[in-house]
Amino acid sequence: MEDKSHEELYEHHFFEVEKNHDLMDWHIHYVGRGGISSFAISAIDIALWDIRGKKLNQSLSKMAGGAARSTKAYCGGIDLNFTMDRLLKNVEGYLEKGFNGVKIKVGRKNLKEDIERVSAVRELLGSQNVFMIDANYSMSVDQAIESARAFSEFDLLWFEEPIIPDDYGGYARISSETGMPLAM
């Protein structure tokens, strides 16, 4: 980041956060999007928004257009290795805090364990609450298809990151073969 875009970034006013973000994004495109490059852009982007907010004496929500009262939020955690009891206690805690949407991690070595966990959480949530799962890119296309078919009975809003994000053909295949809504 420093070698490629700092001179041009310094030439732009820090209030132009969006332009600066686009500039940084353009300068790193040849090394790939994601990974450490996107982390560096994110860190600078956050700092620029912070500077802008402090100079304007405004919160980020105000700079983004004001507080919205209709935004839905869900809760989730890094729970892949939790015992079933701990997982369900976490989900109960989310519900007690007023969340009506929950996302859990899947991608255990044994699909049967994932199915048991998804089934137990869906039972706890009931049909009135939204439910999503996230595999954090842990599956092959074939594993994701098998998993999506197994999870289809649990009324999931989406299946997030079943495979690596750049495999567009794989996402298309999972979607067409299972009908499962996917999130990348």
Regions found by a protein language model. Name each.
Residues 173-175:
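C-terminal helical cap(s) of enzyme catalytic domains, especially alpha/beta-barrels
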Residues 148-165, 181-184:
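Active-site core of metal-dependent hydrolases
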Residues 1-131, 136-138, 142-145, 149-153, ...:
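N-terminal capping/lid subdomain adjacent to the active-site entrance of alpha/beta enzymes
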